[in-house]
Amino acid sequence: RGLHLFRIHSWTPLYVNTDVLNNISYENFYNVVSPGASIYTQNSLGTAEGMLGYSYHGGFHSGHMRFAYRGFYPVFEFRADLNDRDKQRITLVAGDLFNPEMVADTVKGSPYLSASLLTYFPLNLSSGGWSRGLIPKLNWRYSNDSYYSFREGRYQDYQHITVGLQYYQVQRMALRNLFPKWGFGANLQFNMMPFAGENFGSTLYFNAYGYIPGLMKNPGIRLSFAYQRQMSEGKRYLMRNLASSPRGHAAHYSINYTSLSPDY
């Protein structure tokens, strides 16, 4: 009976990466397309969906897997990616939390592995021409990038646990519109690294976004605000920011971080 969850229904000579949860909350829409191949599966009820993919980018042959089950609440989504790049070993060599000097050594020929298990309740509160929803969520993430633990005297892999709550309320869109005409949403998250001991603290993250009409009929304007605070007292490392960096910039390490951005 379990095999009925995996019925191949289509394939494509490309690898397409989609972020399902952000599409649900209207926070972000994006597709990443790479040379490769993808096989898609779905059961007859449409409650189980899967994907196996291969991609080639930047000189790396990569494997990808996705599986989601929505037959009951909560929804479960699992994803894993192998060999998108070489893995890294990160060591704190000098400085303090405000000016950390961390060395990231690339382990050539050692594939990077990342995996996550997300569970959430997509509560649909839509009515009267508005799409509304409340999404409590719990996410576990793993990567074989490693940091040096001075207490343990060895490198340890990364594990993150994030609990969060999202709310969105947007006016239903016409197909020709890039953004909803009116709407807003908010996202509150708490991120921690279990088993990290003296190395990592935790992060509180909040972001809000809103949509307003643009200067012309169809294009709209999206305004975004984000704030995060890392509780890092007595810890050796900072986690990468949950808040997005400005376009064209690499991820930052910050104790306090605030951003405001428009999109048109």
Q: Predicted segment positions?
A:
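C-terminal outer-membrane beta-barrel translocator/porin domains of Gram-negative envelope proteins
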Residues: 85, 91-93, 105, 153-264
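Short secondary-structure junction motifs
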Residues: 47-49, 131-133, 218-220
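Outer-membrane beta-barrel channel domains
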Residues: 53-148
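Outer-membrane beta-barrel initiation region
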Residues: 1-73, 77, 157-181
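A broad, low-specificity signal for short, low-complexity segments enriched in glycine/proline
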Residues: 36-38, 99-100, 146-152, 166-170
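Feature captures outer-membrane beta-barrel proteins of Gram-negative bacteria and organelles
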Residues: 36-43, 61-81, 111-123, 159-169, ...
